[in-house]
Amino acid sequence: MVTTPRLVSLLLLLALCAAAAGALRLPPDASFPGAQAERLIRALNLLPKDSSSSSGRHGARVGEGNEDVAPGQLLERRVTLPGLPEGVADLGHHAGYYRLPNTHDARMFYFFFESRGKKEDPVVIWLTGGPGCSSELAVFYENGPFTIANNMSLVWNKFGWDKISNIIFVDQPTGTGFSYSSDDRDTRHDETGVSNDLYDFLQVFFKKHPEFIKNDFFITGESYAGHYIPAFASRVHQGNKKNEGTHINLKGFAIGNGLTDPAIQYKAYTDYALEMNLIQKADYERINKFIPPCEFAIKLCGTNGKASCMAAYMVCNTIFNSIMKLVGTKNYYDVRKECEGKLCYDFSNLEKFFGDKAVRQAIGVGDIEFVSCSTSVYQAMLTDWMRNLEVGIPALLEDGINVLIYAGEYDLICNWLGNSRWVHSMEWSGQKDFAKTAESSFLVDDAQAGVLKSHGALSFLKVHNAGHMVPMDQPKAALEMLRRFTQGKLKEAVPEEESSTTSFYAAM
C-alpha cells in the first residue's frame, strides 16, 4: 500500500490533535463552525441569516420599477435618508449596485459619501469583516456620517470619516448586507475572488466619478478585513503596474484589529489572556497544548489546500473557544465589558432601520432582504480563514505603499499582541530598523490616545481605551488617526481645516 505525503500529513495532524485532546477535550462545537458564526452574530443582537437560501434575495431586481443593470455596469442614485433633519441640502450621498462581471448574477451594494470638506480629500474604501458582515455596521455604528437613534431618526456623527475623506462602504463578499445573487455559484471562497470583485468595482466606480480619479486612494477596514485588505491592495497595485485599466492612486491601507497571520495570532491568544488576567497559569499551560497541532495544521493549509484548511480552522479555534469557556460573560470584543445574556453589543437598530419601507425606497434596494451578518458567507470562507495574508505585504512596502496596522488594546478576538507580533516578524528591508525604532505617544488633544511605532512605510498603533471596533470606542482618536495617516504625518498633530461645510455639520 502506498501512502501519499498528504495523507501522512493529515494522519499526523489527527494524531497530534488526539494527543492534545487527552489533556484538553475539544469543545462540542469545535467541528461545527456554523454554530460559532451564529453565536458571534447573536452577540451583536443581530439575526444570523443564510443568504444563499433567502428567497427574498433570489430573482429580485434593483430599485423601483424593477430596474436592472447590465453585467459590468453600475446603477447609482443620490440619497437623502429618512430620519435626517428637515431642510438638509443635497449632501453628496449615494447608494448603488454594481453588477459583477464574470459571475452568473452577482450584484454588489455600496454607499458613497462625498467629503464634508473638499473634493480633493482622499477616496477611502471601508471593508467590514466577519467574514460576511455588512459595512453598514460601520456606517451607522462606527465611522459613517450618522448614527441611528432609538426613535429611528439619524444623528450626525461629528467624527465620521466623511469629514476628511470621500468614503465608500461596500457590502462584500456576495451575500453580505444588500449584496446578492440569484445563483449560488457566485459565492466566494477565497481572496482571489473577493479582490477581483473589488478591483472590478473600483474600475467602474471611477468611471462613474472621474472627478475623484486623481485623488489619493486608501483601503481601510477591520477584523476579517485583515485578510481582504492585503489581497485587495495587491490586486490594485498589480493592476496599476500592468496598466490593466484606470490607474488607481493607491497610497496606503489601514487594518484595524485584523486577522492577517493566523499562525502568529492564534499563538498569542493565551499570552494575551494571561496578561489580562482572563485565565490562570494552569489554564494557560493546558490550552497551550493545542498550539503545536494548530501551527502544524496551518502549515498544511498553506500547502495542501481546502481539507487541511478546514481542519486548521477547527483545531485552532479550540484555543479561542477554550479561553471563552473560562472567561464567562466577558465581551471578547472588549474584555473590560460584560455581555448581557447572549448580547455583547446591541446593533439591532440597524435591522429595524433597513426594515423601513421609506429607507429601502430611498436607497433603491427593492425587496432585497438585508443580511447584517451572513452565516453562509462565513462558512463559504472557512477554507480561507487560516491562510497567511501577511505574505503579500512586504512587496507593497518595498514599492512605497504605506501600511498602518492599528489595534484597540482591550480586544481579545483579534488582539493587539498578536497583531504586533506578526508586524514585527514580517520580513522586509526595513524589518530591523522598525524593530529598533522607539515607540512614541500618539497624542490627541494633548492626551495620549495610543502608542505608535513607525519606520518607513510601516506603522503600528496600539489604541488606548478601545476594543475591537476602534472608531466606535474612540471616534475622535480614530478620525485623527485617519487624518494623519492619509497626510503622511502619523507622528504629528495635524490642524483640522475649517470650511463652511465643516461648520455646518459641527452645528448639527
Curated annotation (Swiss-Prot):
Signal sequence, start to end: 1-19
Reactions catalysed: Release of a C-terminal amino acid with broad specificity
Any single GO CC term annotated in Swiss-Prot or TrEMBL for this entry: vacuole
Blocked amino end (Leu) PTM positions: L81
Active site location: S223, D411, H468
GO annotation, biological process: proteolysis
Source species, domain of life: Eukaryota
Subcellular location: Secreted
Binding site for substrate: C414
Pfam families, A to Z: Peptidase_S10
Disulfide cysteine pairs (residue numbers): C133-C373, C301-C316, C339-C344
Record EC number: 3.4.16.5
Top-tier EC class: hydrolase
Glycosylated residues, chain numbering: N151
PROSITE patterns reported for this sequence: CARBOXYPEPT_SER_HIS, CARBOXYPEPT_SER_SER
Prosegment residue ranges: 20-80, 492-508
Family membership noted in the UniProt record: Belongs to the peptidase S10 family.
Oligomer and partners: Monomer.
Protein name (database record): Serine carboxypeptidase 3
Protein source organism: Hordeum vulgare (Barley)
Organism placement in taxonomy: Eukaryota, Viridiplantae, Streptophyta, Embryophyta, Tracheophyta
